[in-house]
Amino acid sequence: MKALILYKSIHHKNTEKIAKTIADELNADIYNIDKVSPDIIENYDLIGFGSGIYFGKHHKSIFKFLDKISKTNKKAFIFSTAGFPFLKSMFHKELRDKLKSKGFEILGEFCCKGYHTYGIFKLFGGLNKNHPNEDDIKKAKEFAKSILKN
C-alpha cells in the first residue's frame, strides 16, 4: 500500500515530529499540506492527515485542501497533537466528517500531547512542555503499525 502523510505544523513543530515518525513506520512520502496540489492523492492508496489542534479542530489548511478534491474511495487516517489530547474524539470530529463526506475510509485516529503556548498558557510557560516525548513517539509508531494491519 502506497502511503502519503500530509500535515501542518506551525509553532513548536510538534505535529511534524509525529508526522515524520508515522511516515518512517509506513515508508510513506511526507509533505507539508501547503506545499502540494490536491491531485497528489491520486498516486496513493492511504493518506494520513494531521495538524495541531487550533480552537478545537485541525488547521484550516487541511479543510481548504479537502475542499479542492473530488470524491474518492481511498483509505485515510487522522493524527494530531494537542494541549488536551483526551478530547481527541471531539477535536477530530470535523475532519473525520469531512473525510467521510469525500469518500475516505477512516482506518484510525491518533492524538498525543503537544507543547502548547497559545493564549494564556504562554504566561505560565506553556502546557505539556517537552511533548511529544519518547513515549508519545513510541505510541505513534504503534499506531502506524496498527494502520498497516488494516
Swiss-Prot record:
It comes from the Archaea. Residues 4-148 form the Flavodoxin-like domain. GO terms for molecular function: FMN binding; menaquinone-dependent protoporphyrinogen oxidase activity. InterPro entries: Flavodoxin/NO_synth, Flavodoxin_dom, Flavoprotein-like_sf, Protoporphyrinogen_IX_DH. It holds the Pfam family Flavodoxin_5. GO terms for biological process: heme biosynthetic process. PANTHER family: PROTOPORPHYRINOGEN IX DEHYDROGENASE [MENAQUINONE] (PTHR38030), PROTOPORPHYRINOGEN IX DEHYDROGENASE [QUINONE] (PTHR38030:SF2). This is Uncharacterized protein MJ0298.
